[in-house]
């Protein structure tokens, strides 16, 4: 199972493209999600991610997340996600491999020590917020993969291993344009696995997928495990 922003959007987590919050609408995603953006204005980047952290904490997993967790009770299912929220975990999925990091993990930008201290309260979005400071003097940053950074080794290794051994790869809610994650479906197809795309929109994967289901995750995933054999035949 490879999930992307679409499944979280159903729970109320806006994507960069859909985020209409007035404070952030005028910024290019690169300014808020890159190593360069952090160097230029860490207060702005911290404010953006702190707001996202609290936004995600206030929403709930949807039927798509719950269906994936239920699949793990009946089949050997690996959950790989490009999302930085914890909705898969709150729905009951274990383990979940986060390719792009997590809004709920933090580390020092200088020494990389994990940060488990308190976070500033945020009742309303604020354009700039001062990040906490590590004991070494470095600023605390979200443990997110930004533009210009490599994917974390362990989640990526698990994702490749799961893809190489999979009979079926379900790709849900992803645009299929962000690499290297988008290459997992290509890897599965090259090894003879079936690739099932769940997305209400056509993507670059649609033409090569074994099966494309034009529904949202919450519409398609409940009951899909039982229907897959017939659909693929």
UniProtKB/Swiss-Prot annotation:
User: Which keywords belong to this entry?
Assistant: Cytoplasm, Metal-binding, NAD, Transferase, Zinc
Cofactor(s) essential for the protein: Zn(2+)
Question: So where's the catalytic machinery, residue-wise?
Answer: 100
Name where it's found: Cytoplasm
Function recorded in the entry:
NAD-dependent lysine deacetylase and desuccinylase that specifically removes acetyl and succinyl groups on target proteins. Modulates the activities of several proteins which are inactive in their acylated form.
Free-text domain note: 2 residues (Tyr-49 and Arg-52) present in a large hydrophobic pocket are probably involved in substrate specificity. They are important for desuccinylation activity, but dispensable for deacetylation activity.
Question: Where mainly found?
Answer: cytoplasm
The UniProt record gives the binding positions of substrate as 49, 52
Bound how, and how many: what does the cofactor note say?
Binds 1 zinc ion per subunit.
Protein name as annotated: NAD-dependent protein deacylase 2
Q: What Enzyme Commission number does this protein have?
A: 2.3.1.286
Q: Where Zn(2+) is bound, by residue? A: 108, 111, 134, 136
Q: Which GO terms describe its molecular function?
A: histone deacetylase activity, NAD-dependent; NAD+ binding; protein-malonyllysine demalonylase activity; protein-succinyllysine desuccinylase activity; zinc ion binding
The UniProt catalytic activity note for this protein reads: N(6)-acetyl-L-lysyl-[protein] + NAD(+) + H2O = 2''-O-acetyl-ADP-D-ribose + nicotinamide + L-lysyl-[protein]; N(6)-succinyl-L-lysyl-[protein] + NAD(+) + H2O = 2''-O-succinyl-ADP-D-ribose + nicotinamide + L-lysyl-[protein]
Q: Which residues cross the membrane?
A: none
* All residue ranges annotated as the Deacetylase sirtuin-type domain in the record: 1-231
UniProt-listed CDD domains:
SIRT5_Af1_CobB
| Pfam families, per database record | SIR2
Any one cellular-component term (Gene Ontology): cytoplasm
Q: Which domain of life is it from?
A: Bacteria
Its family remark reads: Belongs to the sirtuin family. Class III subfamily.
Residues reported to bind NAD(+): 4-24, 82-85, 173-175, 199-201, 217
């Amino acid at each position: 199972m490879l999930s992307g922003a679409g499944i979280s959007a159903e729970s109320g987590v806006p994507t960069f493209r859909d985020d209409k919050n007035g404070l952030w609408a005028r910024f290019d995603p690169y300014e808020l999600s890159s190593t360069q953006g952090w160097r230029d204005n860490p207060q702005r980047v911290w404010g953006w991610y702190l707001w996202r952290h609290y936004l995600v904490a206030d929403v709930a997993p949807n039927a798509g997340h719950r269906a994936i967790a239920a699949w793990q009770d009946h089949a050997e299912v690996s959950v790989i996600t490009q999302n930085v929220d914890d909705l898969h975990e709150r729905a009951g999925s274990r383990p979940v491999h986060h390719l792009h990091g997590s809004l709920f993990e933090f580390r020092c930008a200088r020494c990389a020590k994990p940060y488990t201290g308190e976070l500033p309260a945020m009742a309303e979005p604020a354009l700039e917020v001062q990040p906490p400071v590590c004991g070494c003097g470095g600023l605390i940053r979200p443990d997110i993969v930004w533009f210009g950074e490599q994917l974390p080794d362990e989640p990526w290794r698990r994702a490749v291993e799961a893809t190489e051994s999979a009979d079926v790869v379900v790709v849900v809610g992803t645009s299929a344009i962000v690499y290297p994650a988008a290459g997992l479906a290509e890897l599965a197809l090259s090894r003879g696995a079936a690739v099932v795309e769940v997305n209400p929109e056509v993507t670059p994967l649609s033409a090569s997928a074994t099966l494309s289901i034009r529904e949202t995750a919450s519409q398609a995933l409940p009951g899909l495990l039982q229907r897959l054999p017939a659909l693929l035949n």
